[in-house]
Amino acid sequence: MKITSITLWEVMLKSHQTYYMADGKTCDDVRSVILRLDTDAGISGWGEVCPIPHYLPAYAEGVVPAIEYLAPVLMGADASHPEVVMAACDHYLQGHLYAKSAIDIALHDVASRQAGLPLYKYLGGDYGQKLPLYHSITCIAPDEMARIAAEEKAKGMTQFQVKLGADRNNEADIARLSLVREAVGAGPLVYGDWNCGATSLDATRVGRAVSHLDIMLEQPCATIAECASVRQATNLPMKLDENVFDTHSLLAGYQAKVMDAAALKLSKFGGVSALRKARDLCVSLGVKMCIEDTWGSDITTSAALHVGASTPPQFVMNVCDLSSYVAPKLDNTLPVRETGYITAPTGVGLGVAPDLDKLGAPIASIQ
């Protein structure tokens, strides 16, 4: 089943609400690159990657050139063997995992379609689970964040990510965590995320001020060592995100006793092939996971949901329905959140059929 063509589109995803994070990071209009692999068997596979500006070592303008550079490896390759193809890509071009993620997702879509299975079954798991969602709250005024949390709690959400640090105001961050915790009551998971934007001192001060509450912290600082110092000083559980991007960094976080939970993002690791290895390591270590991607629409959301659905339920902390935060929807037939949960699509492969009218004209085609 050889790859015969690669088509690329660019879609501007508009956030329903401007998304503010620490250190000047925002999500408003973000460029997503959509990829389709066609094969001589008449089976096509879809991929997507949507890098957030200034967030990770990735940028949207680099996706198409990287994929075009990999064309000699991809054209004619057997798409039914995703990991073999990705190993060849890694040998030909080091790094650029974000661009490779879209390729790997599409390869898994093709291979699981050929097998006649939803991707989660192709990956070896059918736990029949509803996947718990979290709702991410943009870093705005504390009382507004509490209002959003209460509204989402009323809809059934039980996990809340509270963005911190956008205004570099410790007192405001303390209020954000305290008011959201109060708004959702006892039981739901509440965690404050600085996206690497805090110093260890500021994160420690905020953490100690809310240490009497049921709160988890997420990636306050830029390094594992700094995060570990905050974890030790506050005695609050911590989730790592930006610092974990392969099996070696996951082991480093675990050995530093700072990784109570980990964010496994498709484009951060390089696609489904790499993410399932990271997932299996976390299961072996007993670490709960958030299985998602940085940003995106229905294709990347579906890929992450399939990985989540093939993961033992006790290790799935949560997933994210990224496509609910942005417009346009590329496929209106896919599952949506319901009382705090979502399921993976049940069709073969990713189960995604993007609306070509919404994609518009391709920006590149490789024959």
Regions found by a protein language model. Give the residues of each.
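Glycine-rich, aromatic-flanked loop segments that form ligand/cofactor-binding clefts
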Residues: 98-99, 104-138
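Structured beta-strand/loop patches that form or line metal/cofactor-binding pockets in enzymes
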Residues: 1-44, 50-54, 323-328
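Hydrophobic faces of well-ordered beta-strands that scaffold small-molecule active sites
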Residues: 45-47, 129-137, 158-162, 190-194, ...
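C-terminal extensions of enzymes
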Residues: 327-367
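Metal- or metallocofactor-binding catalytic centers and their adjacent structured scaffolds
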Residues: 5, 38-114
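Conserved, mostly hydrophobic/aromatic
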Residues: 3, 35, 42, 70, ...
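Shared catalytic-loop signature of beta/alpha-barrel
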Residues: 65, 222-237, 245-341
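Metal-dependent enolase-superfamily TIM-barrel catalytic cores that perform enediolate-based chemistry
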Residues: 124-234
